[in-house]
Swiss-Prot record:
High-level lineage: Bacteria, Pseudomonadati, Pseudomonadota, Gammaproteobacteria, Candidatus Pseudothioglobaceae
Assembly: Probably interacts with PlsX.
Name the record gives this protein: Glycerol-3-phosphate acyltransferase
InterPro entries, sorted: G3P_acylTferase_PlsY
UniProt pathway: Lipid metabolism; phospholipid metabolism
Keywords: Cell inner membrane, Cell membrane, Lipid biosynthesis, Lipid metabolism, Membrane, Phospholipid biosynthesis, Phospholipid metabolism, Transferase, Transmembrane, Transmembrane helix
Superkingdom of origin organism: Bacteria
Membrane topology: Multi-pass membrane protein
Catalytic activity, reaction form: an acyl phosphate + sn-glycerol 3-phosphate = a 1-acyl-sn-glycero-3-phosphate + phosphate
Family annotation (PANTHER family): GLYCEROL-3-PHOSPHATE ACYLTRANSFERASE-RELATED, INNER MEMBRANE PROTEIN YGIH
Gene source species: Ruthia magnifica subsp. Calyptogena magnifica
Amino acid sequence: MLPELLFIVLLLLSYLIGSISTAIIVCKMFNLPDSRTQGSNNPGATNVLRIGGKKAAAITLIGDGLKGAIPVLIAHYLAFNMLNVTWVILVTFLGHVYPIFFSFKGGKGVATFLGALLALSYLTGLSFIITWVFVAKVLKISSLSALISTVLTPVYFYLITNNLASTYVIILICLWIFYTHQSNIKRLLNSQENKIN
């Protein structure tokens, strides 16, 4: 198969993998309310934690992370360069945020992005995690931890990989994460965002 055609097939596969909603599947497995209609109405690990507890949330987090990692690992196996892999990450992320299987209404994409980062540049992924944990311990607000980690991720990525073209794609994803967190940002500005218990 021609490399260009193979890349298009991989992008399509990545979008479909991203479109699998771990939160919805986990909620059905544990007989929990639909995460799209309960809590924050977001099919993500944080909302599953609210409505279903730590076990269900952990499975959701791992599942969403694997969704991000698997397409990256496939791209590595097929020997695509880093720029192409970052486009794979973007498409997988878009699958999570706009899943074809669930009326294009998905999660916010942080866990899927993190899983992809760990597979692409584990030092960048670890830097994201360390930042998130530090901010969460100090400020005790999950969304703010995610947003601060997201802001710093392109800096970490460029310093670690020295790949400017790929960094631009990472910046695009990070901007999109801010877009998916609009409601959180409004609550943060109004001092109404929930804190981590």
